[in-house]
């Protein structure tokens, strides 16, 4: 089974793809999508949608998961993040792929054992779970964490 994880953001969206075979996970790919901050909001959302559609077309995931939005101190930032997250969910769902959602604390707890884990702890655990993985950046590592969480949740529901 091929699983796509997405860490949505308007400036940078991370994506990660893992393969699950039984209880074994392996890294397939990861990357980051940067939108042009000089473009209009609509243009940036289209750019994000197109890039995610390309990732889905290349890796053909069986299922996907998106990190839930956290409420930011700045309402504008929260709104922009929510719009990027909506585009990510639509990109996956439009492809006929089931899409799940996980809060940040659930993802951190699934990977590190505590919902208050730091980014460095997540990256360290990714290198243990996916030996040899080269991370494209923090957002890509967060997306791989989303994919691994989804893989584990799928396994626990069977």
UniProtKB/Swiss-Prot annotation:
Cofactor binding mode and count: Binds 2 Mg(2+) ion per subunit.
- EC numbers listed for it are 3.1.21.10
Primary enzyme class: hydrolase
- Which interval of the chain is the signal sequence? none
Against Pfam families, the record matches this protein to: RuvC
The active site annotation covers 7, 67, 139
Q: Which cofactor does it need?
A: Mg(2+)
Q: Which cellular compartments is it found in?
A: Cytoplasm
Subunit structure comment from the entry: Homodimer which binds Holliday junction (HJ) DNA. The HJ becomes 2-fold symmetrical on binding to RuvC with unstacked arms; it has a different conformation from HJ DNA in complex with RuvA. In the full resolvosome a probable DNA-RuvA(4)-RuvB(12)-RuvC(2) complex forms which resolves the HJ.
Q: Main role?
A: The RuvA-RuvB-RuvC complex processes Holliday junction (HJ) DNA during genetic recombination and DNA repair. Endonuclease that resolves HJ intermediates. Cleaves cruciform DNA by making single-stranded nicks across the HJ at symmetrical positions within the homologous arms, yielding a 5'-phosphate and a 3'-hydroxyl group; requires a central core of homology in the junction. The consensus cleavage sequence is 5'-(A/T)TT(C/G)-3'. Cleavage occurs on the 3'-side of the TT dinucleotide at the point of strand exchange.
Record-given protein name: Crossover junction endodeoxyribonuclease RuvC
From which source organism is this entry?
Answer: Novosphingobium aromaticivorans (strain ATCC 700278 / DSM 12444 / CCUG 56034 / CIP 105152 / NBRC 16084 / F199)
């Amino acid at each position: 089974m091929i699983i796509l994880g997405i860490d949505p953001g308007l400036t940078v969206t991370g994506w990660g793809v893992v393969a699950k075979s039984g209880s074994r996970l392996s890294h397939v790919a990861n990357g980051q999508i940067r939108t042009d901050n000089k473009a209009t909001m609509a243009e940036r959302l289209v750019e994000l949608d197109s890039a995610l559609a390309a990732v889905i077309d290349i890796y053909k995931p069986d299922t996907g998961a998106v990190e839930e939005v956290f409420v930011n101190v700045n309402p504008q930032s929260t709104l922009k993040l929510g719009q990027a997250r909506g585009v990510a969910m639509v990109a996956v769902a439009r492809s006929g792929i089931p899409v799940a959602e996980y809060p940040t604390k659930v993802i951190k707890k699934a990977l590190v054992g505590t919902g208050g884990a730091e980014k460095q702890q997540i990256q360290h655990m990714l290198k243990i779970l996916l030996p040899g993985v080269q991370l494209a950046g923090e957002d890509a590592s967060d997306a791989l964490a989303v994919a691994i969480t989804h893989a584990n949740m799928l396994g626990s529901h069977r």
